[in-house]
From Swiss-Prot:
GO biological process, one term: detection of chemical stimulus involved in sensory perception of bitter taste
Cytoplasmic side: 31-46, 109-133, 207-229, 286-312
Other observations noted: Several bitter taste receptors are expressed in a single taste receptor cell.
GO CC annotation terms, alphabetical: membrane
Pfam name, any one: TAS2R
Species in which this protein is naturally found: Rattus norvegicus
Function: Putative taste receptor which may play a role in the perception of bitterness.
Protein name: Taste receptor type 2 member 140
Gene label: Tas2r140
Transmembrane segments: 10-30, 47-67, 88-108, 134-154, 186-206, 230-250, 265-285
Length: 312
């Protein structure tokens, strides 16, 4: 039974890795090719491209940690390796979440309908708002990395070199929970920002629908459609991020779980659902990416049909 579960989780993990690499790679390639062709790189395309690249790095960071911990767990004993893995995972996770948050901020400022002077000022300076958000996030990243590295140095010094250590620092409670609590604390900030944006978008849509009812217009005007589309994107991000957040919290119980291989596969599968699933949503929600995806599907189908006709 355990072997069957491990095989199922491993297959799920492989599928998620493939989807994550192909989906995020597709987003980056399409936007870069469009930039090369048009010599124009819009703000939303810049955010999407940077997000896709960070997600690719995040997927590979999780895969690297899983492979090293299962095949060469002794490498994770050294302080240097601990710091490298923690720093790489923290940085890729940070940009993956904060760039998605910046995308939500962009949609909110472009679509929401408020007459407040502060909101209107931010709307006219959306690029500045996104840039400042990323700048502030870099300061938070610096603090996060400093805290994690300091705690790792202090914790490792207190233990012998022969301590038992495996995936995601799960055999030593003090060290294993350092990245858990610090990353959970710092990644909760963009989650709160996105949740606030979601609530404001709902309020903006409610006000807009109320205004349209007074004007006796249909509910599906362009502004309503844009609101609903933005809400779908934000809701999907919140849902996938919540799953990822719960996966981080689950790591706190890893020390009490005896079947650590199964648990690690479960954690990796849940964690990879965030960057892999969100890339598919971004492709389907963006008209340019969706059109490019449908073009590739049509080309593959035509090539397959042509190969069948040419075969004897």
């Amino acid at each position: 039974m355990k072997v069957t579960v491990e095989c199922a989780l491993l297959i799920t993990l492989i599928v998620e890795i493939i989807i994550g690499c192909l989906g995020n790679g597709f987003i980056a390639v399409v936007n870069i090719m469009d930039w090369t062709k048009r010599r124009r790189f819009s703000l939303v395309d810049q955010i999407l491209t940077a997000l896709a690249i960070s997600r690719l790095a995040f997927v590979w960071s999780l895969l690297t940690v899983l492979v090293i911990s299962e095949l060469h767990s002794s490498l994770l004993i050294t302080r240097k390796m601990l710091r490298i893995i923690n720093n790489f995972w923290t940085v890729t996770n940070h940009f993956s979440i904060w760039l998605a948050t910046c995308l939500s901020i962009f949609y909110f400022l472009k679509i929401a309908n408020f007459s407040n002077s502060i909101f209107l000022s931010l709307r006219w300076r959306v690029k500045t708002v996104v840039s400042l958000t990323l700048l502030v996030s870099l300061l938070l990243l610096l603090v996060n990395v400093i805290i994690i590295n300091t705690c790792i140095v202090i914790s490792v010094e207190g233990y012998k070199v022969n301590m038992s250590y495996s995936s995601h620092f799960n055999n030593n409670p003090q060290i294993s929970r350092i990245p858990l609590f610090t990353n959970t604390m710092f990644t909760f900030i963009p989650f709160t920002v996105t949740l606030t944006i979601f609530l404001l978008l709902i309020f903006s849509l409610w006000r807009h629908l109320k205004k349209m009812q007074h004007r006796a217009k249909g509910p599906r005007d362009p502004s309503t459609t844009a609101h609903i589309k933005a809400l779908q994107m934000v809701v999907t991000f919140l849902f996938l991020y919540t799953i990822f957040f719960l996966a981080l919290v689950m790591q706190a119980w890893n020390n009490e779980i005896q079947s650590k291989t199964v648990f690690n596969l479960v954690f990796e599968s849940i964690a990879l659902a965030f960057p892999s699933g969100h890339s598919c949503v971004l492709i389907l929600g963006n008209s340019k990416l969706r059109q490019a995806f449908l073009t590739i599907i049509w080309w593959l189908r035509s090539s397959f049909n042509a190969a069948e006709l040419s075969s004897p």
